[in-house]
C-alpha cells in the first residue's frame, strides 16, 4: 500500500488494478484521513488518468448496494455537477422524457453541489422517496421504467471520505467519478462533465466500465449539461472508439438563450419548473430539456442523430407521455411503500 501511495506522490500513474487496490483500502476504512488527503491532492496535481478513474469507480461499485436489473438494458443521464451554473434540474427533468421513450432510466443523483437544488432535493419536493430499498428501486424500474438512486444511500462506504473531501475544500477525483458508479449495470449513458479537457478520457473510462455506447458532454459556458448558449462539445464512445464532436442549438432547430435564462431556484421553485416543462410550457427551460433529452436518446441508440432525438423528445412532451411518467412513478411508489 505504501508503495502505491509513493508512486502517486512521485507523480507516477497507477494502473487500473493498482488504483482498485488503493481505493478498496479507502472504501473499507483502512486508510487514515491524513494519507487519504495527501493521496487525493497528489492525484489532483498529477492529473487523473482514464485507468485511475476506472479503477476507483470499479472499487466504488464493488462496495455499493446493488440494485438488480437485467444487465444491458438501463441507462443513466446524470452529470458531475460542479459547473456553478445554478441551473434548474435539467437532467432530472430529462430523465422523465427518456423514460417516456421506453428507455429504463436508473437516475443516479445527489443533493446540491453547484446549485441551490440537487436532483435529490427536487425529487423530495416532487414527493419521490429517495431512500427506497434496492428491491423497490428494481420494482419501479420494471413497472414504470424510471427509478431514482440517491448516491449516499447506495454508496454507504463514501462515509469514509466525506470528512476529508469537506476539509480539502477543492474538487478531487470523487467529483469526476460520481456518474461512473451507478450500482445498476448500465448499457448506455449520457454524462455531463464540467471539465471539457476530460471529455475523451471520460468516454474511454465508460468503455472500460462496460458501456456499449455513451456520450460525455460539456455545454457552452462549461456546463455539465447541453446548453442553448452556444457550442456544445461532446465525445461519443461506441465499438471501442471515441470520436469528438461539437453541436450548436441551431443545428437541431432550437434557438439560442443566454445561461441566465435557465437559472434555477430552490427545490420548490425547481420542482415547479420541472412540472411546467413536462406540461410543455414553451421557452428556454423546455428547449434546454429537449436538447438534453435529445442527447440522451442519441446516447441510448434510440435515434441516429441528436436532431432526431430533439424531435422525438418534443413529441413525448406534447403527447403527455413524459408527464405521465412522473405521475406513474408517484403512483407505483405509494404501492411499494404500503407493502
Curated annotation (Swiss-Prot):
Anthranilate 1 binds at residues 79, 110. Binds 2 magnesium ions per monomer. Pathway: Amino-acid biosynthesis; L-tryptophan biosynthesis; L-tryptophan from chorismate: step 2/5. The keyword Cytoplasm does not apply. InterPro entries: Anthranilate_Pribosyl_Tfrase, Glycosyl_Trfase_fam3, Glycosyl_Trfase_fam3_N_dom, Glycosyl_Trfase_fam3_N_dom_sf, Nuc_phospho_transferase. Signal peptide: none annotated. It catalyses: N-(5-phospho-beta-D-ribosyl)anthranilate + diphosphate = 5-phospho-alpha-D-ribose 1-diphosphate + anthranilate. GO terms for biological process: L-tryptophan biosynthetic process. Its cofactor is Mg(2+). It is an enzyme of class 2 (transferase). Anthranilate 2 binds at residue 165. The keyword Glycosyltransferase applies. Disulfide bonds: none annotated. Its EC number is 2.4.2.18. Mg(2+) 2 binds at residues 224-225. Coiled coil: none annotated. Catalyzes the transfer of the phosphoribosyl group of 5-phosphorylribose-1-pyrophosphate (PRPP) to anthranilate to yield N-(5'-phosphoribosyl)-anthranilate (PRA). Homodimer. Belongs to the anthranilate phosphoribosyltransferase family. This is Anthranilate phosphoribosyltransferase. The gene is trpD.
Amino acid at each position: 500500500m505504501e508503495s502505491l501511495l509513493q508512486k502517486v506522490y512521485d507523480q507516477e500513474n497507477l494502473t487500473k488494478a493498482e488504483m482498485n487496490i488503493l481505493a478498496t483500502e479507502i472504501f473499507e476504512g483502512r486508510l487514515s484521513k491524513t494519507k487519504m488527503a495527501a493521496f487525493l491532492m497528489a492525484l489532483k496535481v498529477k492529473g487523473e488518468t482514464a485507468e485511475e478513474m476506472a479503477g476507483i469507480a470499479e472499487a466504488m461499485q464493488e462496495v455499493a448496494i446493488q440494485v438488480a436489473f437485467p444487465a444491458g438494458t438501463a441507462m443513466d443521464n446524470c452529470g458531475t455537477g460542479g459547473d456553478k451554473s445554478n441551473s434548474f434540474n435539467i437532467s432530472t427533468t430529462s430523465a422523465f422524457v427518456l423514460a417516456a421513450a421506453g428507455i429504463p432510466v436508473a437516475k443516479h443523483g445527489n443533493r446540491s453541489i453547484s446549485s441551490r437544488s440537487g436532483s435529490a432535493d427536487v425529487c423530495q419536493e416532487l414527493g419521490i422517496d429517495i431512500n427506497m430499498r434496492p428491491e423497490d428501486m428494481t420494482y419501479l424500474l420494471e413497472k414504470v421504467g424510471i427509478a431514482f438512486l440517491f448516491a449516499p444511500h447506495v454508496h454507504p462506504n463514501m462515509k469514509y471520505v466525506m470528512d476529508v473531501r469537506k476539509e480539502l475544500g477543492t474538487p478531487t477525483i470523487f467529483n469526476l467519478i460520481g456518474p461512473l458508479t451507478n450500482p445498476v449495470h448500465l448499457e448506455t449513458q449520457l454524462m455531463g462533465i464540467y471539465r471539457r479537457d476530460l471529455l475523451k478520457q471520460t468516454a474511454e473510462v465508460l468503455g472500460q466500465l462496460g458501456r456499449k455506447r455513451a456520450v460525455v458532454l460539456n455545454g457552452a459556458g462549461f456546463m455539465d449539461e447541453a446548453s442553448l448558449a452556444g457550442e456544445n462539445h461532446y465525445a461519443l464512445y461506441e465499438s471501442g472508439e471515441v470520436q469528438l464532436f461539437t453541436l450548436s442549438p441551431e443545428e437541431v432547430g432550437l434557438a439560442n438563450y443566454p445561461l441566465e435564462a435557465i437559472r434555477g431556484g430552490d427545490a420548490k421553485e425547481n420542482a415547479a419548473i420541472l412540472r411546467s416543462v413536462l406540461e410543455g410550457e414553451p421557452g428556454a427551460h423546455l428547449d434546454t430539456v429537449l436538447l438534453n433529452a435529445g442527447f440522451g436518446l442519441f446516447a441510448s441508440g434510440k435515434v441516429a442523430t441528436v436532431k432526431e432525438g430533439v424531435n422525438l423528445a418534443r413529441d413525448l412532451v406534447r403527447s403527455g407521455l413524459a408527464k405521465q411518467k412522473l405521475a406513474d412513478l408517484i403512483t407505483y411508489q405509494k404501492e411499494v411503500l404500503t407493502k
